[in-house]
Amino acid sequence: MEPSSWSGSESPAENMERMSDSADKPIDNDAEGVWSPDIEQSFQEALAIYPPCGRRKIILSDEGKMYGRNELIARYIKLRTGKTRTRKQVSSHIQVLARRKSRDFHSKLKDQTAKDKALQHMAAMSSAQIVSATAIHNKLGLPGIPRPTFPGGPGFWPGMIQTGQPGSSQDVKPFVQQAYPIQPAVTAPIPGFEPTSAPAPSVPAWQGRSIGTTKLRLVEFSAFLEQQRDPDSYNKHLFVHIGHANHSYSDPLLESVDIRQIYDKFPEKKGGLKELFGKGPQNAFFLVKFWADLNCNIQDDAGAFYGVSSQYESSENMTVTCSTKVCSFGKQVVEKVETEYARFENGRFVYRINRSPMCEYMINFIHKLKHLPEKYMMNSVLENFTILLVVTNRDTQETLLCMACVFEVSNSEHGAQHHIYRLVKD
């Protein structure tokens, strides 16, 4: 599965768990009912902590395991209430609430045209998205939909769990290494219930949903190892990869992270992240969380090639400078600067950096990382390892794109994965 093709759709397992309308009837398999008030409260809290993530899994680094959203919601309920609810019960409850919420929204829409549009756009949403008030608001542009508030604060992170409460645990969090809060994508509601996720036709669908601005767009990025098996064949292993994706207006917009939360992970001196963001343009800054795939046999033979490839597109003919800064504990260790000229292809200017050799520091770092016996040890090291990628217009010195990259180790069966956020300063 391509990591960049994650959408808000449900996983195959969740699709299999769809229930008929009879699921609207309460299920009483214990004295208090499956969704007694305390369980429902914890369920709603978990919905806020874990936004819909489709087929993506959420990693708990201190355990080295990856979980689906429904598994984490069930886990959260257990930790908060001490009562067990299965992943299937959570999935069924989400289906029930989605149907109820759909009916409620339809009943509030008096205009038939608006109702038809609402039906059309809700048909493309998963039950998990429908249950999310934020997702409904963003999809349909319905003003004034209240978001649930719960004790413990409005954030998505474990600060919501008050210490000392029954079952409180620091295990309940989407990304252990990220202590910074994620803000949902915000779009202004449009009168008449037009879908806010569909901008004017002149704006391409990828804009706001991938790494790019009106001046430059990242099409593909990969760091890889090539090993020669025999004189005629090579084996290519992807450590990290952002692949080409066909975005649609129904895809969710990127979530936002406050850039001040990651300043200490990147150089602060001249040319550092803080200074670059201050100069702007601020819509060119992105955070990429990579789950690197280290599940490969690394040999020290001369036939091994460590490389990085990337491709960008623009409507402008420019000469660009690509800077890659490898950082440890927020300090720059090594920097590589490359200059690339445009090639005009299919009505746009394309910039390709193909098979750029990885620096010796990075190769040694990967080897040492691979020799660590446990994944939690690797993640502990990676917590203090970052990469800053900056693409600049060589002639004007304008920042075209800036990608702040943080890392964890992927579970071997899932391969390389990533998630992209916009960097903002509120």
Curated annotation (Swiss-Prot):
The modification Phosphoserine is found at S11. Its main location: nucleus. One of its GO terms (cellular component) is nucleus. Keywords: Acetylation, Activator, DNA-binding, Nucleus, Phosphoprotein, Transcription, Transcription regulation. In developing skeletal muscle and myocardium, in mitotic neuroblasts both in the brain and spinal cord. At later stages of embryogenesis expressed in several developing structures such as the olfactory system, the intestine, and the kidney. GO terms for biological process: cellular response to retinoic acid; embryonic heart tube morphogenesis; heart development; hippo signaling; lateral mesoderm development; notochord development; paraxial mesoderm development; positive regulation of cell growth. Residues 15-28 have a biased composition (Basic and acidic residues). Residues 28-104 bind DNA. One of its GO terms (molecular function) is DNA-binding transcription factor activity. Residues 1-12 have a biased composition (Polar residues). Residues 1-31 are annotated as: Disordered. This is Transcriptional enhancer factor TEF-1. It comes from Mus musculus (Mouse). The lineage of its organism: Eukaryota, Metazoa, Chordata, Craniata, Vertebrata. The gene is Tead1.
